[in-house]
Amino acid sequence: EVFWNMDYKEIYNQWLENPYFDEATKEELKAIKDDENEIKERFYMDLEFGTAGLRGIIGAGTNRMNIYTVGAATQGLSNYLNANFKDMKQISVVVGYDCRNNSSLFAKISADIFSANGIKVYLFEEMRPTPEMSFAIRHLGCQSGIILTASHNPKEYNGYKAYWDDGAQVLAPHDKGIIDEVNKIASAADIKFQGNPDLIQIIGEDVDKIYLDMVKTVSIDPEAIARHKDMKIVYTPIHGTGMMLIPRALKMWGFENVYTVPEQMIKDGNFPTVVSPNPENAEALTMALNLAKEIDADLVMASDPDADRVGIACKNDKGEWVLINGNQTCLMYLYYIITQYNKLGKMTGNEFCVKTIVTTELIKKIADKNHIEMLDCYTGFKWIAREIRLREGKKKYIGGGEESYGFLAEDFVRDKDAVSACCLIAEVAAWAKDNGKTLYQLLMDIYVEYGFSKEFTVNVVKPGKSG
């Protein structure tokens, strides 16, 4: 038995000697035998399974992301699902993963463990955006789902996020219930690694197609796009999952001039072309902005590695490229949805939108002026998903977002979605052109109409390598 509550040095030795651990793990650990500090870092605690799942540095050890810590998480989740849905004939889950190092390995091991516990698995054939995984849970009628991703963390990291049957990240009471089950896994011997291939079904293009068809229904004003289909858009997935769907989605919406950054359209968990794959940072958009200047583009968009967040840039009145922050994007996003819904006579009085408490209050002013219910919730997209779930079948969700660059216009996904967001932001730019404006001028007009707020500042991108 490998009990993971002893002194760190003892646990280190257990991992070296115990037959349950594989040779590669032991080799990695032997290599640090003289580095007391590194041994301590890796073994002084268990990598904690929290309300958002796991996140940590990849490597051998109890405080690292590896097949054993991921295995314990999946075994604990399996035990919880089997207890929670014990009357169900066949429990099923979706397993997705991003571009990170070991993501596909951890996903395949998790699929084996779920199936070893009698749970049917829909495993994506290749990396896919997180929002598509959320969609697949709902579409396939699953009870849960996981995605292996660490969002925009540095390359050394990976992570594991658990979702519930509504396609949203787990909330109370299930989050605590799962944590308790994961904490009960005392040793590697408790993890069922021997998969049952009969219970694993590979999914891919079949789900892509249905998801993209659904995303197309998010478009509010296709005519505006048709009038500006030649608008030049530069997009980068920053080596991540957005490359699988976002250029395709933009073309499906009718945008004919989508330029991608070739060096960043290569799947790579080391993110070699950026310091950090975070679309909030100007530095991550450097290559996209260089391409935009070269071709005189109208709009630049970048999604993070798991394609749930999007950063955008456009030109100001002096022709300089500026970054639009998450608050400003959310403001334009919801301004467009609400005013267009009104203008096109789509409002029934039953609509609502949601923002997190830290997101700009100007959205509330827009909602009030247009007589639409606007809800505030805690920070984190699972709380927006909760508001949607509470009103399921009663009210119509038309959009929401948060200042940390996450937006969602549709209710068939229950997590932030950069696929639909990129398409809708491009549509907003086309609509602005209809009115003889740039995206930047539209933003300024919103400030003039609703009042300038503290996030009014727009960052001009400084030329040069570091952004």
Model-based region annotation:
Residues 94-157, 256-311:
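N-terminal small/polar loop signature for handling phosphorylated ligands or for N-terminal nucleophile
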Residues 106-114, 157-164, 308-328, 363-366:
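Short Gly/Thr/Asp-enriched flexible loops that form oxyanion-binding sites at enzyme active sites
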Residues 43-63, 150-153, 233, 237-249, ...:
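Conserved phosphate/anionic-ligand binding catalytic regions in large, soluble enzymes, centered on
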Residues 163-192, 327-351, 355-365, 418, ...:
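Glycine-rich phosphate-binding loop plus the immediately following alpha-helix
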Residues 38-43, 47, 158-286, 291-292:
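Gly/Ser/Thr-enriched, mixed-charge loops and adjacent short helices
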Residues 7, 12-110, 201-229, 241:
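An N-terminal, well-structured beta->alpha segment
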Residues 293, 297-299, 320, 340-467:
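Phosphate-binding and adjacent anionic-ligand microenvironments
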